[in-house]
Amino acid sequence: MGNSSSTPPPSALKNSDLFKTMLRTQYSGSVKTRRINQDIKKQYPLWPDQGTCATKHWEQAVLIPLDSVSEETAKVLNFLRVKIQARKGETARQMTAHTIKKLIVGTIDKNKQQTEILQKTDESDEEMDTTNTMLFIARNKRERIAQQQQADLAAQQQVLLLQREQQREQREKDIKKRDEKKKKLLPDTTQKVEQTDIGEASSSDASAQKPISTDNNPDLKVDGVLTRSQHTTVPSNITIKKDGTSVQYQHPIRNYPTGEGNLTAQVRNPFRPLELQQLRKDCPALPEGIPQLAEWLTQTMAIYNCDEADVEQLARVIFPTPVRQIAGVINGHAAANTAAKIQNYVTACRQHYPAVCDWGTIQAFTYKPPQTAHEYVKHAEIIFKNNSGLEWQHATVPFINMVVQGLPPKVTRSLMSGNPDWSTKTIPQIIPLMQHYLNLQSRQDAKIKQTPLVLQLAMPAQTMNGNKGYVGSYPTNEPYYSFQQQQRPAPRAPPGNVPSNTCFFCKQPGHWKADCPNKTRNLRNMGNMGRGGRMGGPPYRSQPYPAFIQPPQNHQNQYNGRMDRSQLQASAQEWLPGTYPAXDPIDCPYEKSGTKTTQDVITTKNAEIMVTVNHTKIPMLVDTGACLTAIGGAATVVPDLKLTNTEIIAVGISAEPVPHVLAKPTKIQIENTNIDISPWYNPDQTFHILGRDTLSKMRAIVSFEKNGEMTVLLPPTYHKQLSCQTKNTLNIDEYLLQFPDQLWASLPTDIGRMLVPPITIKIKDNASLPSIRQYPLPKDKTEGLRPLISSLENQGILIKCHSPCNTPIFPIKKAGRDEYRMIHDLRAINNIVAPLTAVVASPTTVLSNLAPSLHWFTVIDLSNAFFSVPIHKDSQYLFAFTFEGHQYTWTVLPQGFIHSPTLFSQALYQSLHKIKFKISSEICIYMDDVLIASKDRDTNLKDTAVMLQHLASEGHKVSKKKLQLCQQEVVYLGQLLTPEGRKILPDRKVTVSQFQQPTTIRQIRAFLGLVGYCRHWIPEFSIHSKFLEKQLKKDTAEPFQLDDQQVEAFNKLKHAITTAPVLVVPDPAKPFQLYTSHSEHASIAVLTQKHAGRTRPIAFLSSKFDAIESGLPPCLKACASIHRSLTQADSFILGAPLIIYTTHAICTLLQRDRSQLVTASRFSKWEADLLRPELTFVACSAVSPAHLYMQSCENNIPPHDCVLLTHTISRPRPDLSDLPIPDPDMTLFSDGSYTTGRGGAAVVMHRPVTDDFIIIHQQPGGASAQTAELLALAAACHLATDKTVNIYTDSRYAYGVVHDFGHLWMHRGFVTSAGTPIKNHKEIEYLLKQIMKPKQVSVIKIEAHTKGVSMEVRGNAAADEAAKNAVFLVQRVLKKGDALASTDLVMEYSETDEKFTAGAELHDGVFMRGDLIVPPLEMLHAILLAIHGVSHTHKGGIMSYFSKFWTHPKASQTIDLILGHCQICLKHNPKYKSRLQGHRPLPSRPFAHLQIDFVQMCVKKPMYALVIIDVFSKWPEIIPCNKEDAKTVCDILMKDIIPRWGLPDQIDSDQGTHFTAKISQELTHSIGVAWKLHCPGHPRSSGIVERTNRTLKSKIIKAQEQLQLSKWTEVLPYVLLEMRATPKKHGLSPHEIVMGRPMKTTYLSDMSPLWATDTLVTYMNKLTRQLSAYHQQVVDQWPSTSLPPGPEPGSWCMLRNPKKSSNWEGPFLILLSTPTAVKVEGRPTWIHLDHCKLLRSSLSSSLGGPVNQLLS
């Protein structure tokens, strides 16, 4: 190869990027030698560029024998021969010897023979090689740095573009000459390539090469770059379909003719820049096209046969820099092949563009029948992919959860309970299971479908269920019920072979069917008989036997499904077991055990039987078609019934819906059979009905005789009685005889005397003894307390004393009894006693000691437990009180003392500790309730006896009435304990279900207290209760109505109580599981244990977050949720191992550095509680029960990295950084300053060209230095809108708001943990909005007040100086001396100013009229606004100041515009224009229009008077009343006014609740009277009645003083007389207008316009004429002025502010208007115009436009 030139060392040649760059340039095709050598010298400065050595080295390379080298070397040499022949003459001489050396050494560096040839050089060349190697390495380092910054990419593309242009020009010249020769040599391989869509002719690429020779190896491959061994031939023009269009691409691989037949060689030809641009356009858009990206890249690389270098070249064009950076570090090293690189880039895209998942749509996906399981899963795959952007194979757990949760609830529960390991199964394994359970569900749904039919008395038809009797539902509050058994006729059995002398009906010999004596006595619905015992009719379903009759196994064979009565009676005697279940509803008379009676009750012809109801014998119609028993209120004989409040609408015999009222349980008797039922009462029914409910309860059998009689057969009845004959029967009385009588409390006031030393009570040091006087007690309460205090004194519980202390007592009457109990208010004593540590365990901890194996329970209630512990004499003085002049004190622990529970519990524990080893059962003690739980009955009885004997010996008293002895179901601590677990008491369920919607605060508290005790049974108690608790904090008038959200929460809590599950008793020997979740404001969890392979709940735990926790990111909120749930669960697990299931990496969050979002104390609590050794955290791989139970969960997020997500969410934007951005668009410095009570903010910008700083923003303001810093940073963000910016600040507060705390405060509503607003919350909220405006932003913290010459130091100093100057930027007031100078720069007049400056003189570019300046039109508004100033000067002041220096024709109009748009002036200025007052329309007659109002007359009853005034005549009606409510108003109208004066047309009143109540409005609506309500807060709207109120009170006071009467009601008639007789302004009195004559008084006895001697007709005619004249006189005096129309809807107004912080508030948009009132947006009531101030734009159309329209 030659030794005249040095060779780069092999280590340098291994740089594949440089090598590939050289090859792309070297083999471009048509570049001159000089340009190639210049480019090579630029890339490799150590290589010589003598072109003369090119021919020598090329010739040496061609002459090397191929058989003397290896196979790889032969491939290279063969390629060089091809290139030499293809590039004849000048083209061949362009390749340098060093290029050939690099090519050979770079591609065959593993070949030892070739390496030795290249290293044989002269000794002088070796020294040069050493130097060149060092320089070459340095050059490579610089090249790598340049490649990282991507600076050389644009230059290389430009070079390639120029080369391509030169190549195209050269080829166009030779096309005609070579075309014919090419067709002759290569007729098959020559292809015509059309011009591509990027405008470049590429047809010469395949034809520009001359034929060359090759060896037997046509697939040339040199380092995977020069040729492609994968494809021997690649078409030069490929068409790729994209969105229906054809795009043609040229290849980076070219086919060159070899000259040996049709063989071609593939030579690499890099992508052109224009081709790369086209490929970038065709690439799927990011991030939407990430799912199609891998397929598109693979297809493109396969078509072009690209290698790793081509992938990198294409990646630089289509992928952003962050994606390429991520792709380079995914596997920690370079990808092994092209496919690996493609996969790396796709993975990097998914990391850089995280999928935005619509989890709401995914969670809402549900199964839609009749889909199969396979169709359902396929549909789920489509929904999951479309809404998450992920294939389900990449998110298996969320997809499986989505599929399982979308199934019907019953199918989901069956799937999870029947397959505990379902979460570990795959989708193909789950599909058969889902199909199985879906099939089961469809079959169950088909069974329960029923045909509707309206039944009588509206009760569902009960069905017979095997031998268990009638089973069905009972009526609810629904108005109608329509159910029917879906009966199908049973198939008739074949007649079989019946002997000729045998009856076909009864199968008895001796007669035939027609003469069968049993036919007329057939029972109804027996066998296959038809209705009424007739054969062949529609058959009834065979009904089973009564529950207490057990037929033999062969009864069907024996009787063939048919029986008559005699057979049934005989069989009953054989089948009777002697006893029947205790739950049997029949209450039989007590007879000897074992006896039985069968009763036949013969009905009358009217199908009636005699029934005794509450000792009243009545006839009742037997109706088997009636569902319910009904008592008729209109019958001849009606029994006494106690009715309830339950009422339904039922369909009776009349086929019309009739109301029925439910009666309380009533005892009825038929013959000797007694039963308790709850009949329904119909007051309009004339007969009594004995329905199917009572007949089925008595097991009655109805049959019909041949003569038409109907017989009711009552089966045998038996007694229920307790006996000790069986093993499981306990005689309680005999068992309790073994205990002494002093153990039992005989009276409610009986107390025990515990054998413990008296208790000494210590008080705090320097505490003053309270002495609170007893307020007087009413006589009835005093007499009610006297027996109680006397009894307590006789027992020594109370003693008389003289004490410095005294506290009051309160008598409380017992519900339903004429007795009182005493409440002693000891709060003052509780405040002075020394504190004690409470040792009373919670009910939850007490019950946690029970084991699931304990099935027998005994509950012992200690009577008056506190009173059994004595108090030392030295401490008794503390509890003194006064009663009837005597002072008493307690000698025992009193109720209400803060330490009574603790002291009693300590004494009881000490007492029971003595028998600790004598009892093997579990003992639970809570205050005075003792529970004994045992595994078996005998142990329980034995330990109970030991306990009771010990209590008797220790001086306790036990309540025998409350004793629950040896039962499997007991009531303890308000819960029902059973072997299965804990249940809610049925009485509590009934109380909750019947609880009406609360309308007062007290009712809400009562409801929350009722359901709050059962919160462990309610999965989402805290979520639902918070809506009701919000109402407690509101200051709302009672009664109120709950909103829709509160009603929904109320109903959900009721439903949760009524459908509560059974909670199992925790087993300490088994591990616990805690499934956790959380909503936005509450934590949710369920504590479970596995029993018999099933996960069963122990308790549902929920708790509300505080303000801090509510604003945390989801992952940290999960930590808070688990911590709260664990705190509640500790009372159950008691230190046992616990497995916590969660979807968050809790341990990772706690073990990393402490987050700035959580305080150190809170984080320490989390670490101490959540990192305990007995806790195990498990990632949920299945659907958490907490998620299934919780319907309000808002935190469902896909799988994620908790640390990364917390870091991302804690900032206002994900790309926010604190590191400088390279080459930003702007570099800003912000700073704030505060001094002498004033603040200022400034922003300066760095100019890199001149390296200086300019001020781009300055503003005064800021109540503190922190506020000024926030304003400065917000201004900097606003100035960098849509730009990349680096913002430097020296404020740690502003930096922390942006990076650490601001986003967290925004999430929790800018409040502290105490609920108070955060300081500067408005500025922080504004800053968080502004920081979203830049395209990319980095906020960097720098040190303040440092010295140096760096850009950061100088920029911060400039910002600090600008902020200090901004403090003193104030609004200057224009003065005469500087008026002209201040406007020199803006005095630019336009064409519109010509008409305003007419006649003015121009001086120095300013128009003057005398000494006054005529400003330009555009300046006028700014000048007047400045004069308006901070103090908001009025129009006269503005005009006066303006006229001193300026003049303009539009000045007054502009001032009006400024004042009309100034919000502050509109709020505080008085109303500028008085309004013409309106009047009421003239009524048509007297008492057609009334005004009413309440007025308070005194403080004693009757306190109020209802004043009613006739608007036409002013006739007053004043009625005293005790209350001012709606019922009083309705009573007076209906009993006094309307009967006396008739129905009015209209009634007016204010909007008091007594007038707006529903009863008042419905009353007037029903009688056709219009009730008009006046505008609130405007007494003049009710002026007539308001003036009457004032007159009335004044006259009452004067009359009382004149007549010396104390009661105002006594002088009211005289006042009414005077008011009705006094003439008004028209000269007529109300009496004259109404009666047609003056009222006769002492002074007017002889005055009358009528004559007594007239006839009746004449008198009436005169009276009519006189009334008409009076009425016309009233009409003439009535105001007739008309009011202008009201403001137009759509205009704006201000409303009077009642809070007086400003005179007016608003503005408000007017929606509707009348001449006197308006309806505005946001206010529910009409507003009188006296309370409105219309904006000027609403009154004058000339002032309604913008400024430019106003002044044009």
From Swiss-Prot:
Alphabetically ordered keywords of this record: Aspartyl protease, Capsid protein, Coiled coil, DNA integration, DNA recombination, DNA-binding, DNA-directed DNA polymerase, Endonuclease, Host cell membrane, Host membrane, Hydrolase, Lipoprotein, Magnesium, Membrane, Metal-binding, Multifunctional enzyme, Myristate, Nuclease, Nucleotidyltransferase, Phosphoprotein, Protease, RNA suppression of termination, RNA-binding, RNA-directed DNA polymerase, Transferase, Viral matrix protein, Viral nucleoprotein, Virion, Zinc, Zinc-finger
Role of this protein: Capsid protein p25 forms the spherical core of the virion that encapsulates the genomic RNA-nucleocapsid complex.
Start and end residues of each Reverse transcriptase domain: 793-977
Lipid attachment locations (N-myristoyl glycine): 2
Domain Integrase catalytic span(s) in chain numbering: 1482-1638
Ranges for region Disordered: 168-222
Species whose genome carries this gene: Walleye dermal sarcoma virus (WDSV)
Entry binding sites for Mg(2+) 3: 1493, 1550
Disulfide bonds: none
SMART domains per UniProt: ZnF_C2HC
Active-site residues from the entry: 623
Bias-annotated ranges (Polar residues): 201-217
GO BP annotations, alphabetical order: DNA integration; DNA recombination; proteolysis
CC per GO annotation: host cell plasma membrane; membrane; viral nucleocapsid
Composition-biased stretches (Basic and acidic residues): 168-178
Note: This protein is translated as a gag-pol fusion protein by episodic readthrough of the gag protein termination codon. Readthrough of the terminator codon TAG occurs between the codons for 582-Ala and 584-Asp.
InterPro entries named in the record: DNA/RNA_pol_sf, Integrase_cat-core, MLVIN_C, Peptidase_aspartic_dom_sf, Retropepsins, Retrovirus_Pol_polyprotein, Rev_trsase/Diguanyl_cyclase, RNaseH-like_sf
Post-translational modification: Specific enzymatic cleavages by the viral protease yield mature proteins. The protease is released by autocatalytic cleavage. The polyprotein is cleaved during and after budding, this process is termed maturation.
Domain RNase H type-1: 1222-1368
Binding sites annotated in the UniProt record for Mg(2+): 1231, 1269, 1290, 1360
Positions of CCHC-type zinc fingers: 501-518
Domain Peptidase A2: 618-694
Protein's recorded name: Gag-Pol polyprotein
